From Swiss-Prot:
One of its GO terms (biological process) is translation. It comes from Mesomycoplasma hyopneumoniae (strain 7448). Pfam families: Ribosomal_L19 (PF01245). This is Large ribosomal subunit protein bL19. Disulfide bonds: none annotated. Keywords: Ribonucleoprotein, Ribosomal protein. The keyword Amino-acid biosynthesis does not apply. It comes from the Bacteria.
Length: 121
């Protein structure tokens, strides 16, 4: 009984996003609060981890900013995540791309794949 009730409550909070996976370059529009103002900040980078766990699904995006690697974890169904855009899809053979942290320059390139129209999750 309680499991069904929790499932019903969680299903009302799940949001639809385009389908993406580790290895994809994404642009995340994230709401941040500065004082009493709210603005949208864009974080663009490579998805190195994606964990599907119902309402607490999360993903990690990594980018290089001023020659320093920056990683940020986002909750997929958070109300602070405004939208997620897939910029390009890359061919990878792993679920977690932690090895990309050590790479730079040409060794950090990934092979791009063409995908059909992206479907919602």
């Amino acid at each position: 009984m309680q499991a069904k009730l929790i499932e019903i409550l969680e299903s009302s909070q799940i949001r639809l996003y385009p389908q993406f996976q580790p290895g994809d370059n994404v642009r995340v529009y994230f709401k941040i609060q500065e004082g009493n103002k709210t603005r949208i900040q864009i974080f663009e980078g490579l998805v190195i981890k994606f964990k599907k766990n119902g309402l607490s699904s999360n993903f990690v995006v990594r980018k290089i900013s001023h020659n320093v690697g920056v990683e940020r974890t986002f909750l997929l169904h958070s109300p602070l995540v405004d939208k997620v855009e897939v910029i390009r899809s890359n061919k990878v053979r792993r679920a977690k791309l932690y090895y990309m942290k050590k790479r730079s320059g040409k060794s950090a390139r990934l092979k791009e794949i063409k995908r059909k129209e992206l479907k919602n999750l």
